[in-house]
């Protein structure tokens, strides 16, 4: 069985407080990948959503990245309009930090030992790598794959470095 996880495709990472041209460019690629995944019935689909609150500045992340973003209930917190239809019937995991331990535990309980977990989304160098590494730890015998063309980092350089780091840790980059 295969699982596709769409990481943090939220307005604040695309056009908002932490948006970039690279993130905007991957939206149609992510949409196409999801459509193909569903059309070919490859497996389960999940989304993650970075979720913060008004006390963000008081958190460790907020002290290190002092840009208020993805505040629950705000437009920036929402999954981008182009992908919202795909979230209607699948689990969306709100996460207060880079990696989503709740998602990993849920997959362990409901999916057993997947053959492959595929990750796409934002940001390669923060939340994609964090979730890929977390899932590799939870599922050491599962192939973890990151689709390069469907990810963007904070910068093109940090995107590339994150992909290289994941490859060193036996995460497939395709």
Regions found by a protein language model. Give the residues of each.
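Internal catalytic-core helix/loop-beta-alpha segment
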Residues: 73-126
């Amino acid at each position: 069985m295969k699982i596709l996880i769409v990481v943090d495709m939220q307005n604040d990472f695309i056009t908002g407080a932490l948006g970039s041209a690279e993130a905007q460019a991957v939206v149609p690629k992510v949409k196409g990948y999801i459509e193909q995944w569903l059309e070919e019935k490859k497996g389960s689909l999940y989304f993650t959503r970075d979720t913060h609150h008004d006390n963000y500045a008081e958190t460790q992340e907020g002290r290190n990245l002092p840009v208020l973003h993805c505040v629950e209930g705000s437009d920036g917190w929402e999954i981008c309009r182009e992908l919202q239809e795909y979230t209607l019937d699948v689990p969306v995991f709100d996460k207060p930090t880079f990696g989503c331990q709740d998602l990993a535990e849920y997959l362990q309980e409901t999916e057993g030992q997947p053959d492959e977990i595929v990750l796409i989304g934002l940001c390669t160098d923060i939340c994609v790598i964090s979730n890929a590494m977390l899932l590799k730890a939870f599922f050491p015998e599962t192939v973890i794959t990151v689709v390069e063309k469907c990810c963007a980092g904070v910068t093109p350089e940090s995107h590339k470095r994150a992909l290289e780091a994941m490859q060193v840790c036996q995460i497939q980059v395709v």
